[in-house]
Amino acid sequence: MTVKTPVYLDYAATTPVDKRVAEKMIPYLTETFGNPASNSHAFGWEAEEAVEKARADIAALINADPKEIVFTSGATESDNLAIKGAANFYKTKGKHLITVKTEHKAVLDTMRELERQGFEVTYLGVQENGLIDLEELKAAIRDDTILISVMWVNNEIGVVQDIPAIGEICRERKIVFHVDAAQACGKVPVDVEAAKIDLLSMSAHKVYGPKGIGALYVRRKPRVRLEAQMHGGGHERGFRSGTLPTHQIVGMGEAFRIAKEELEQDMAHYRKLRDIFLKGIEGIEEVYVNGDLEHRAPNNLNVSFNFVEGESLIMAVKELAVSSGSACTSASLEPSYVLRALGRNDELAHSSLRITFGRMTTEEEVQFAAELIKSKIGKLRELSPLWEMFKDGIDLNSIEWAAH
């Protein structure tokens, strides 16, 4: 069988909308177009009914009450609403927040903004495997700590933090616990009750739903309070004003309904693809998987190939849509801050590829990707004087390079 290229292996960036989801959305664009807040006629009632059905489907995936789901424009807005909203509401109790150095920018930049407003933030480091040390977390907690934010699944390296254990610590100390679950929903089981989570951010477009829609779970018992960040008509119980986009909400609801129904088979599919890929690149020397392989979402692999420059590798495998672990925008050639936090050196951080599988990925595509990467790595290393020196047994760290 011939594989159609380019092969999409960047499902952590975004996913295609599942055809079943797209079909469900279409009527809400043209026929059932009412405003869900219009409560004086059938157009509004029908739209509201569709929104509430979606709310229930989203709640079901994470074991929440539908009343605890607040619609937003995506996980970035959910992170902002959760962190700024809780910090500002509880600031009379204290102004200390805790998060992790490997969080998504939506959390880190929000924390930085709060620092500018006078809050104090502790950024926890991670161990070599990408997981935080729970003892270190406990030691960082102070009497004035009001919020802890830890992501469930890391977007770059896919590692799964011990969220239930952190939830236990927070509940014991009466600290608000926020979790960014954009990469977790539909990839690993998520249960806000079992994990004692207070605030949880979700996104539709990582789960085969449309872009531009997300949700924030806000616990009711024990009740968590937030200060709204968007003011207007008081929609979403006052947490988030703005007309609800019925078609997008219906899409998110259907995507989450399917994700709950097919979670087991999706996870088994991802595991199988991951094993095929790892077997396919087995023979390559100096290959490092970034992040813990056990505590990891099954659809994510982040691999560093020593003595190969990440950018040249991406160009060499142009038949694959993958992302480089480094921020390979032309303006920023900084290596990935997540990989640096694992203690990877600049060379390894620069030579990484993030390969993420999805529901639509086939075994043939993964086989093709592994073989292609294997052959290109060989070719790129043949061009590398560093590889030659390494093969000759020269310790590259001991060399004094001439300055220009």
From Swiss-Prot:
Q: Which GO terms describe its cellular component?
A: L-cysteine desulfurase complex
The subunit field of the Swiss-Prot or TrEMBL record says: Homodimer. Forms a heterotetramer with IscU, interacts with other sulfur acceptors.
- Entry protein name: Cysteine desulfurase IscS
Q: What is its EC number?
A: 2.8.1.7
Q: Say which domain of life the source belongs to.
A: Bacteria
Q: Spell out the disulfide connections.
A: none
Q: Which residues carry this modification: N6-(pyridoxal phosphate)lysine?
A: 206
Entry binding sites for pyridoxal 5'-phosphate: 75-76, 155, 183, 203-205, 243
What is the protein's known function?
Master enzyme that delivers sulfur to a number of partners involved in Fe-S cluster assembly, tRNA modification or cofactor biosynthesis. Catalyzes the removal of elemental sulfur atoms from cysteine to produce alanine. Functions as a sulfur delivery protein for Fe-S cluster synthesis onto IscU, an Fe-S scaffold assembly protein, as well as other S acceptor proteins.
The residue range of the signal peptide is none
- Coiled coil regions in record: none
Q: Which organism is it from?
A: Neisseria meningitidis serogroup C (strain 053442)
- The residues responsible for catalysis, as annotated, are 328 (cysteine persulfide intermediate)
- Which family does the entry's similarity section mention? Belongs to the class-V pyridoxal-phosphate-dependent aminotransferase family. NifS/IscS subfamily.
A GO biological process this protein is involved in? [2Fe-2S] cluster assembly
Listed under catalytic activity are: (sulfur carrier)-H + L-cysteine = (sulfur carrier)-SH + L-alanine
Q: Which cofactor does it need?
A: pyridoxal 5'-phosphate
SUPFAM superfamilies named in the record:
PLP-dependent transferases
Q: Which keywords label this protein?
A: 2Fe-2S, Cytoplasm, Iron, Iron-sulfur, Metal-binding, Pyridoxal phosphate, Transferase
Q: Which PANTHER family match?
A: CYSTEINE DESULFURASE, CYSTEINE DESULFURYLASE FAMILY MEMBER
* Positions that bind [2Fe-2S] cluster: 328
Biological or metabolic pathway of the protein: Cofactor biosynthesis; iron-sulfur cluster biosynthesis
A GO MF term: metal ion binding
Compartment annotation: Cytoplasm
